């Protein structure tokens, strides 16, 4: 169950980062303020909830194992950037993502 909490904390953290990115997207001048307040408010909510879940994780998992698992954020953000904003990702970047996933699998299997 704690591993599910860790993944959910990671996803919420990423959601907060993505909301911040969305807040910077161009909108019409008459809608800009509402747009920014909405997305930054969602970002704060996601990041705040992620922090609360992270505290639960730290109570149950050694920090030397838990913290590297947050590198999952790089994987989630890359996938979201490609899907949501059609951002280009180089083969070198994908290689790095693969190494991160490999590292997470190795660390996770030691517990």
From Swiss-Prot:
Domain EamA positions: 40-109
Domain of life: Bacteria
Bilayer-spanning residue ranges: 36-56, 61-81, 88-108
Keyword Membrane in annotation: yes
One GO CC term, this protein: plasma membrane
Membrane disposition: Multi-pass membrane protein
GO molecular function annotation: carbohydrate derivative transmembrane transporter activity
InterPro entries linked: EamA_dom, Flippase_ArnE, Small_drug/metabolite_transptr
Statement: the UniProt record of this protein carries the keyword Transmembrane helix: yes
BP terms from Gene Ontology: lipid A biosynthetic process; lipopolysaccharide biosynthetic process
Pfam families for this protein: EamA
Pathway in which the depicted protein is active: Bacterial outer membrane biogenesis; lipopolysaccharide biosynthesis
UniProt keywords, alphabetically: Cell inner membrane, Cell membrane, Lipid A biosynthesis, Lipid biosynthesis, Lipid metabolism, Lipopolysaccharide biosynthesis, Membrane, Transmembrane, Transmembrane helix, Transport
Subcellular localization(s) per the UniProt record: Cell inner membrane
Role according to the record: Translocates 4-amino-4-deoxy-L-arabinose-phosphoundecaprenol (alpha-L-Ara4N-phosphoundecaprenol) from the cytoplasmic to the periplasmic side of the inner membrane.
NCBIfam families documented for this protein: PRK15051.1
Entries under HAMAP family matching the protein: Flippase_ArnE (MF_01869)
Record note on quaternary structure: Heterodimer of ArnE and ArnF.
Record family assignment: Belongs to the ArnE family.
Name of the protein this chain belongs to: Probable 4-amino-4-deoxy-L-arabinose-phosphoundecaprenol flippase subunit ArnE
Organism expressing this protein natively: Shigella flexneri serotype 5b (strain 8401)
